[in-house]
A protein has these predicted regions:
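Catalytic glycan-binding domains that act on GlcNAc-containing polysaccharides
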Residues: 4-199
Length: 199
């Protein structure tokens, strides 16, 4: 691990520990890396929040399941996205080239958002656990985009603890990043913005 990567990964870890002890380091707790080449057609707050949860901004992150890089892309998913983008797929670049990883991951997020009609809850569930698992959950638990199904209750019914926690942590971060990036505290209809409908 190079010195730069150690610093980035370490700074978020230190910020989390510091916050637990009552001394929050806000700029390090929710970093907004200006060096990343963000796709203007994808919600920057969502991308940053996914990166924060997936890899803590460590570009060479590797999971036990084989997910790689900042946005923890599975190689097969990354390969398919690269094909759709008509760019060369290079597995090694997933952990060495931040902007390559973000480009593929952002496109995949955009694809999922379109597939699930803007619902961040369903998008994040699919991103973390896979569309196949989400399809089963929608069949078993109903669709949280529909009236009469509380999205917050739906999240709690997800059988995978990791995915339940993942959705909550990412949505929390999205709200904070929205505030940081806009420079003002928004008061949107959060249910509609994040869950895809009004309560």
């Amino acid at each position: 691990m190079c010195i730069r990567d150690r610093f980035i990964k370490g700074s978020l870890t230190v910020a989390k520990k510091s916050t637990e002890k009552g001394t929050p380091l806000h700029s390090e707790l929710f970093p907004t890396n200006k060096d990343f080449a963000f796709d203007q057609n994808v919600d920057k707050s969502l991308v940053l929040s996914v990166i924060r949860q997936e890899s803590e901004f460590f570009r060479a992150a590797k999971s036990r399941t084989g997910a790689l890089g900042l946005m923890q892309l599975m190689p097969n998913t990354a390969k398919e996205v690269a094909r759709k983008l008509k760019i060369k797929y290079q597995k090694s670049k997933l952990i060495t080239d931040e902007n390559y990883n973000i480009r593929l991951g952002s496109y995949y997020l955009k694809y999922l958002l379109k597939r699930y009609e803007g619902s961040k809850v369903l998008t994040l569930a699919a991103y973390n656990a896979g569309p196949a698992n989400l399809k089963k959950w929608l069949s078993n638990m109903g669709d949280p985009r529909k009236k009469g199904i509380d999205p917050l209750v739906w999240i709690e019914l997800i059988p995978y603890p990791e995915t339940r926690n993942y959705i909550k942590r990412v949505l929390e971060a999205v709200w904070i990043y929205d505030t940081k990036i806009s420079g003002s505290i928004e008061k949107p209809n959060l249910a509609k913005k994040y869950f895809g409908h009004r309560f």
